[in-house]
Amino acid sequence: MKIIFAGTPEFAAVALAALHAAGFEIPLVLTQPDRPAGRGMQLQASAVKQFALAHKIPVAQPISLRLDGKYPDVAQEAHDLLRATPHDVMVVAAYGLILPQSVLDIPPLGCLNIHASLLPRWRGAAPIHRAIEVGDEKTGITIMQMELGLDTGPMLLMESLPIAADDTTASLHDKLARLGGEMIVEALLKLEKGELTATPQPEAGANYAAKIAKEEATLDLRQSAQELARKIRAFNPFPGAMGICNGTPVKFWQAQALECSNQWPAGQVISANAQDGVVIACGDGALRVTELQKPGGKRLPAAEFIKGFALEAQRFQ
């Protein structure tokens, strides 16, 4: 079976590696154009492109696939390339570009998507973040047949994964990426044998996992400690949850919710020492923050952080 693969970040690169290791022929990879990254803002290839080049897989990086969009000539060139590349199916994982119907219609066996949620629970761009943020106890991977709607297509395979109490988006991402790689291989093997069956998605229980905005990073300490602890895990590694102390943004990377009386105003630092970490009053309960970072600094354990940043008796806004 010949596969065109479309994906961009590390999540997708893990799936591409799994397909390559399983022996599937991959005549073409689509990925987003190189982007400026790092302190020097040098152009950097996506994780998918890096894997493809290392394994001598041809790569295309169209800026758009929409024939009716801002770049119709680029889109037409991409359509022509897809039609000229012999393949059976397209596999899509966190590609980042909209696939119009004109693209979905090209692969003889359609387009399969690896989605990091138990659909229809979280449709959209940030299902891992949102699952942690709201306190879901489990998530998983859905392999689905793509259609024009956003993550609305028929479900082909689904497998759940528990969300651990200390999972961050980073750790859960890695677990789901591995699971997604295993499942897309399984799905394609079943497709080859004609054993893959589709189940329509129910609309009941569908939620939209909106892309994480940088503005969400600043915590409202009037919320409960439980809510805030989940946000800190959900926003690790991006965008990094933060509080503002005397005008300075301080990122919180690790924290636990504590039960305590509400005798302090929200944001008040109750204690800041090597033994307790940094304990901050919230609207309900308190946060024990154990890893912090100031602008331009490194992520540090609380015991190290407070040596260079006085927090005792301070208040976060």
UniProtKB/Swiss-Prot annotation:
EC assignment: 2.1.2.9
Amino acids binding (6S)-5,6,7,8-tetrahydrofolate: 117-120
Keyword Transmembrane helix set for record: no
Cellular compartments per GO CC: cytosol
CDD domains: FMT_core_Met-tRNA-FMT_N (cd08646), Met_tRNA_FMT_C (cd08704)
Organism domain of life: Bacteria
Keywords annotated in UniProt: Protein biosynthesis, Transferase
Molecular function, one GO term: methionyl-tRNA formyltransferase activity
Catalysed transformations (reactions): L-methionyl-tRNA(fMet) + (6R)-10-formyltetrahydrofolate = N-formyl-L-methionyl-tRNA(fMet) + (6S)-5,6,7,8-tetrahydrofolate + H(+)
Function, as annotated: Attaches a formyl group to the free amino group of methionyl-tRNA(fMet). The formyl group appears to play a dual role in the initiator identity of N-formylmethionyl-tRNA by promoting its recognition by IF2 and preventing the misappropriation of this tRNA by the elongation apparatus.
Family in the record: Belongs to the Fmt family.
Protein name, per record: Methionyl-tRNA formyltransferase
Taxonomic source organism: Herminiimonas arsenicoxydans
